[in-house]
Amino acid sequence: MKPTQAQMAPAMDSREMVSPAVDLVLGASACCLACVFTNPLEVVKTRLQLQGELQAPGTYPRPYRGFVSSVAAVARADGLWGLQKGLAAGLLYQGLMNGVRFYCYSLACQAGLTQQPGGTVVAGAAAGALGAFVGSPAYLVKTQLQAQTVATMAVGHQHQHQGVLSALETIWRQQGMLGLWRGVGGAVPRVTVGSAAQLATFTSAKAWVQDRQWFLEDSWLVTLAGGMISSIAVVAVMTPLDVVSTRLYNQPVDRAGRGQLYGGLADCLVKTCQQEGPLALYKGLGPAYLRLGPHTILSMFFWDELRKLVARAQHQGT
């Protein structure tokens, strides 16, 4: 019996193969485009994750309550443009992290590593880890900028940066080069599991949808459906590490550049669960899905469709 596409779970359709360098550009571009649409949700998610940090439930004010009211609260406090706080840093992060991530994943596909059992998971995880490390300084600045607001609505530590370049300069001057990678211990596991889930499930989900024959073989709806299924897996595995990563990046530091609240990933997990309860690791889950879900769907959709266009153009030119 002939195996289905889902059983074969091809890492990359041979008709859509492009060079790793092209994948770098397409992956970075696709995720930057998705970021423009989802950044307001990232602002809300960041503030919900910082609200009530290391305080017992019910003992702190809650300026942000749920998704819709939080969007309105941000707009009232910071203006409509406040919903795009940290956008420049977010675009820088998406370009750096996903450019590296898709480049490395494409190299793995080209080498045939993703055709091995579990290959897509391993390749996605390794590519995500490297991308997270490269993009960490941009994510650090993005988180701190998105947390900044007026005193009456402030949650978490307020860093008072004036912009991306100002923030990078301040961190470099006060903490040195290593300060730019503070919090990377939470970012790498976060993106590692998220990338593994995203790239592996997107490949399998797209093949599964194709097998159902709900849409034409090359329809963009196949890609969209694959992205929607993939987004569920991404949010499920990333949210606890996303909360931890946000807090590690935003915490104040002493003169030596050491975090004043957490000693690292494990310390943050333990303190958060002890003082706020285990459910605190899912703070901002609604906005997290509303942000990570559409971002996963849009980024994978843009990436896959752009790859098809480039591959067809290359094929027609030969």
From Swiss-Prot:
The chain crosses the membrane at residues 21-41, 59-79, 112-134, 184-205, 220-240, 292-315. InterPro entries: Mito_Carrier_Antiporter, Mitochondrial_sb/sol_carrier, Mt_carrier_dom_sf. GO terms for cellular component: mitochondrial inner membrane; mitochondrion. The lineage of its organism: Eukaryota, Metazoa, Chordata, Craniata, Vertebrata. Putative antiporter that exchanges dicarboxylates and sulfur oxoanions across the inner membrane of mitochondria. It is found in: Mitochondrion inner membrane. Solcar repeats lie at residues 18-111, 115-208, 218-309. GO terms for biological process: blastocyst hatching. Disulfide bonds: none annotated. It is a multi-pass membrane protein. It comes from Mus musculus (Mouse). Belongs to the mitochondrial carrier (TC 2.A.29) family. Keywords: Membrane, Mitochondrion, Mitochondrion inner membrane, Repeat, Transmembrane, Transmembrane helix, Transport. It catalyses: a dicarboxylate(in) + sulfate(out) = a dicarboxylate(out) + sulfate(in). This is Solute carrier family 25 member 34. PROSITE patterns: SOLCAR (PS50920).
